[in-house]
């Protein structure tokens, strides 16, 4: 009985392939005049399912992710709490160490700079850990950075005694202040006629006009 069923289904399949699924026998809204490979695979899979020899269809989420539309976002990352790692969540989480080698691995306290080497922004005072009334000079900035290199907050705690921003500020406070310029030096001197700004009207010198 089973052999007759198989032979009948195979003969029907061959008959269908010979006539290439003619619209006179059936209707396909996508390709009415030609059989697609997808239709053939779907038909063969149906025959194999009825015969009991079809393999179960396995779907992978990684392949399905390509079909997502619209804005997508990924949350989580290093040091952002526990994450669901792996398809079954069986990959352990590893907390990243964000401190230096010589700093105690204690996240309960802030392990930032002992004295932040930055001037106070608007609305901040020395109580916020910044430097008030910092001179706006290149010399002060240069000295500030040179003195800052004497102390590495991550690996050089013994160098803490060398860092003293109050003495540095007192040292630089007596220096010359930056003079304000009321004249732009770039606008002085003879104008170059061959330099034309973008989107400007071409300017011809008097010599070119006389030559014409």
From Swiss-Prot:
It holds the Pfam family Secretogranin_V. Coiled coil: none annotated. This is Neuroendocrine protein 7B2. Residues 171-212 are annotated as: Disordered. One of its GO terms (molecular function) is unfolded protein binding. The modification Phosphoserine is found at residues 141, 205. Interacts with PCSK2/PC2 early in the secretory pathway. Dissociation occurs at later stages. The lineage of its organism: Eukaryota, Metazoa, Chordata, Craniata, Vertebrata.
